[in-house]
Curated annotation (Swiss-Prot):
Disulfide bonds: none
Record InterPro entries: RNA_pol_sigma_r3/r4-like, UPF0122, UPF0122_fam_protein, WH-like_DNA-bd_sf
Free-text function comment from the UniProt entry: Might take part in the signal recognition particle (SRP) pathway. This is inferred from the conservation of its genetic proximity to ftsY/ffh. May be a regulatory protein.
Similarity comment: family membership: Belongs to the UPF0122 family.
Protein name, per record: UPF0122 protein Exig_1902
Source organism (scientific name): Exiguobacterium sibiricum (strain DSM 17290 / CCUG 55495 / CIP 109462 / JCM 13490 / 255-15)
HAMAP family attached to this UniProt entry: UPF0122 (MF_00245)
Amino acid sequence: MTLDKTNRMNYLIDFYQELLTPKQRNYMSLYYLDDFSLGEIADEFEVSRQAVYDNIKRTEAMLEQYEERLGLFAKYEQRKLLLDQLKQLDLPSEAHVTIAALEQLE
């Protein structure tokens, strides 16, 4: 698994975790955030490794569908890019205070 995919999944989990079931949330959190192996998750929940794998793959697909429809991560990336561009401009100090406040909201 590539670092880019892991980072993307971490963001998608952050944005859409409330749309997941508790079991999906647990599996994804352990796999992506806590770096558990499929076997470790299977042992933790007393299920087969294949069951964990299937659940994670289905949940990844769901998260990608949520992102395709809602676009929260894409919008976040666009805002971050625009804020970075604003910081590079020669603006009055009051504008930089406002930019910093906007960054705190992210």
